[in-house]
Structure formats: structure tokens, C-alpha cells
UniProtKB/Swiss-Prot annotation:
Cofactor: [2Fe-2S] cluster; Mg(2+)
Organism: Sodalis glossinidius (strain morsitans)
Keyword Endoplasmic reticulum carried by entry: no
Protein's recorded name: Dihydroxy-acid dehydratase
Positions of post-translational N6-carboxylysine modification: 124
Lineage of producing organism: Bacteria, Pseudomonadati, Pseudomonadota, Gammaproteobacteria, Enterobacterales
Gene name, Swiss-Prot/TrEMBL: ilvD
Function: Functions in the biosynthesis of branched-chain amino acids. Catalyzes the dehydration of (2R,3R)-2,3-dihydroxy-3-methylpentanoate (2,3-dihydroxy-3-methylvalerate) into 2-oxo-3-methylpentanoate (2-oxo-3-methylvalerate) and of (2R)-2,3-dihydroxy-3-methylbutanoate (2,3-dihydroxyisovalerate) into 2-oxo-3-methylbutanoate (2-oxoisovalerate), the penultimate precursor to L-isoleucine and L-valine, respectively.
Amino acid sequence: MPKYRSATTTHGRNMAGARALWRATGMTDDDFGKPIIAVVNSFTQFVPGHVHLRDLGKLVAEQIEASGGVAKEFNTIAVDDGIAMGHGGMLYSLPSRELIADSVEYMVNAHCADAMVCISNCDKITPGMLMASLRLNIPVIFVSGGPMEAGKTKLLDKIIKLDLIDAMIQGANPDVSDEDSNQIERSACPTCGSCSGMFTANSMNCLTEALGLSQPGNGSLLATHADRKQLFLNAGERIVGLAKRYYEQDDTSALPRSIASKAAFENAMTLDIAMGGSTNTVLHLLAAAQEGEVDFTMADIDRLSRKVPHLCKVAPSTQKYHMEDVHRSGGVIGILGELGRSGLLNGDVHNVLGLSLPETLARYDVMVSDDAAVKSMYAAGPAGIRTTQAFSQDCRWPSLDTDRQEGCIRAREFAYSQDGGLAVLYGNIAEDGCIVKTAGVDKGSLVFRGPAKVYESQEAASEAILGGKVVAGDVVVIRYEGPKGGPGMQEMLYPTTFLKSVGLGKSCALITDGRFSGGTSGLSIGHVSPEAASGGLIGLVRDGDIIDINIAGRGIVLDVADSELAARRETELARGAAAWTPVARERQVSFALKAYASLATSADKGAVRDKAKLGG
């Protein structure tokens, strides 16, 4: 029978000092022996997805205490990728994932906490906490802040839906008036919550639900809606039960590694492909799998991408649907229901509620459930009122969207495509693979051949695009922006956005060893592995080289003779210590980022730290 971890600090005469300190935090004799639950919050006033979380940790803590546990809250950092975008701040985004994971480990292990409730929301915070959860393998429940309501405004006598990406595109479009650009900017992000499309934050929150580590509805229920409060109350109550099941009954099914098994990872990736999630999710799932010692690799993602249909198209791939529309259609469980009916899911998995996948679908899939409370929850809709307050409105859609032919979520026979919204490409330029969000690619660009325009920073590429140096038919190559080469694997949202702004969004391709925002669409291929800084062939591409891309064939090839590539490699190696670094790039890199780069692996490994360098 496992012993409560917290007993290390609460039992025995030699722990009198520790107990004295616990008493100073408010604990009493009656509390020693109860499970100590870490409430891992990520409140910050820097991030709209987290600005409303200040009081939610207290809400969870009160429920933990009422359910027989002891709650102790701490906070992690949280970087807003949108605010950090387009300047040196983006170098810190991906490395912050590792810092978050480590800080959770440090706090939980230093104080011997027994279990956790992770209150996350945005891009690197959910993955960082997920990595820590699987590393620590103690009972955990995720409950996120929830999605932002979609923005809405009236232009040319027409009401249109908006999000952050619209503000970025129109702000850089010289044909849009200052007045219209300002109106879009002011309307794009109306409430607290994670940005309203299927960007990285919402994609990851959907995936924690598919993994079984959060409750049904967590990935899609709006941050502003009163119904979301129940998810936090349930999490506080449920985590005490999970802790007692494990520590008092030796029930290992309560542990995250039992819940997030390989079968669960495959289900999560299947969902991701079906909903056309952010390409960043690939990076984060691979990293989380390594922490949980799950044998889940790029090969598994490639295999799944060839058989899973694209069932749900959401912004930025279309402006018709946002997360509030996904929720109205049944949310994550609605998509899983369609996948389950197509025989594409592993049923032998369970979630933090203790329900198997078939049980979860029977209760929460709006297409089959007869539970009025479930249907009412999925009818929770937007209010259209600017606010930074959680649970501030109780509006409901007049009806659910159960149209599986032309609605937000489609049945397999009416899929947008029979192969899904993400694909892995291989070829000489990406021997270990690269990722493209096919959900956002125009059908006319699925096969593309063009000359390379090579840049060694996203800043140089952006300047060239806006300066008219990139023309239709070009393949923009941005290298030395990988985990090691950047360092930090910046998101290339500005170059892809600027391609759209100058009318080249459907007539150019972009490939990079960096990554993309969840807001990216178009023929944007990222995570090229191995990266240039690790000797990858992308580091040998020259201006004018022809690059062939075939998404259906899952191929990406640099059309240069092997003998020429071998000669280029010798030339590069002759640079000595400067080999596999940018030729001319001015970039200030801090000691902290250099430390990150020294251990970073390429994207096909999840950009995690190289354990071999540490003897692990």
C-alpha cells in the first residue's frame, strides 16, 4: 500500500520543524494525515487566457478542503505567445514549457504533495503542466480557464466573426483603412479566455480531455459561462477521491500514467487530426509521452494521419466556426463520438471520472445522450459582452448543432477530407519528418514545386515578404529557428500572416525548422527535423534550389543532386566552430537561452532536453 507522500513532512517527532511551518500556513492537528493537494495555478495579468484565474484557485481549494483534503496553492509563469510574437520575446516561449514543468516538479517534490489540480489554459502552460504530471505520476486533474468568445464586428453592413489572426492580417494589409483595421483590432479579442479559434491553447485543452485527464466539456466550454464553474468545483472534489483511491486503496488506475496510456495518446492524436488542431500539439504530445515513458513517436502520428478523416474545421482554417461553435456541436466528446462510430478509437481507456471511453460517450455525446443536463451544458453560448470575469454570463444557444452533414462537426461520410487535418511529411530535407496543418492548406497547393528563397531568421523573411522580394511560386525557407538554432523554436506567425497580407497566402509555400502558431494556415510546413543547427539538410538549401512538396504523397524533397549536397556539407563543415550556425544574423541570446539550447533536441523528439547529455 503506498504511503501518502506528505507523511514525510507531517509525521514523526523529527518532523516537528516541518509541522511547525505547516501550522504557520493554517494547518491544524486534524489536517495532518489528510492528502495535501497542490493547486497549481497560472494566474497572470499578462495573458487574457489567465487574467481571470486569480479567484479560481481559491474556488478549487475550498472544494478540496470541503472534501477532506488540504489545499496548498502555488503559481507558475505563463507567457502570452501573441504578445511575445514578432520580436525577441518569442525566443522564450517554448523554453518556458520546460521551466513550467520543472517548477511544478520542484514545488510538488520539495513539499511532498500527494496530488495536483492543474489550472492551465494557454499555449505552453498546459503542455508544461502535462509534462510535469506524467513525470511525477501522482493523481492529477486538469481544469483550464476556457476559450475566449469569438469577436464580432460589422463591416460593409455585414456582421463577421473575428479573432486575433484577423487583427494581425488586416493590420498588415495596406488595402485596409486605418479605421477598419482599428475596428477589427478592438473587436477581435472581446473577453478573457484562450484565443477563440483552434489555436494551440484550445487544441491542447481539447487533447487533455481526450487523454482523460480533464472532464468532459473542459476543452470547449467558454471561459465567461457560468456552467464552467462546475468544472472547477468538480475538480476540487474529485481530486481528493483520486488521492484516496491511490494512497488508501492502492488503486493505480487513479494515476496519470494509467489514464494517459499509449492507447489514450493515440486517441488524443486521432482527435487532433480530426479537428485540424495546431501543429504545436505534435511537439507537446511527443514531449509529454517521453515524460510518461509512453512509446509514442512521429511514426505513430504518421500512421494515424493516413487513416483519420478531417471532421471539424475551425478558425483559423475557416472564419465560420470558432470554439463556441465546437461546444454547441458537442465539443471534444462530439468529435470523439463520430470517431468512435467510425471504429477509429481505442475503447480500453478511462478518464479522471473513472469512466471508460464507451461510458463517457454514452453519457456525454449529444448525438446519443438522453441526459438533459449534458445537453444544457453543451448549449452554453456567448454573451457578446466585453469582460475579463469568469462565469459572468449564462446565455444559451436556442438549439444544439447536431447537423453532422454540414455542421461544425461532421460524420465521417461528410468529412472535409478522408485523411485528416495534420500530416507528417518525409524527404531528404526532413529525414526525421516535418509537420503541416493540412486543414489550412488550399486544395490547389497540395502539390507544390518552386524555387527556394532562404532566410536565416523570421525577421529577415518578414522584411523580404513585406518588401516585395518574395513572389508567387516561391518556397520561403526559414532556418536556424529550431529548438537549438533559434534558440527556442520561434513561431513563424508573422511571416505566414504577411504572406496573406500581400496576397501570397495561396501561391507560396513556407518551410522552417521553427514552428507555427496555432493561428497559422496556408502551405506552412514546420518542425523540419533534423534542424539546421543539428546538421539537418535544411541548412544546405540555397536560393533558387527547387523544392517539391506533395502532401498526399507525404513527401518533401530538395531537388539537388546528392553529389552537390555532399560538396555543400563539406563546405559547411570547413567553417569549423561556426558550422551549422547562421552566416550573418544579429541576435542577442541570453545565458538562460544558451543553457536551453545546449540540451535541446529537434522537433521530432518533442524539443525536449537530451537526457543522454546528462547521463540519463
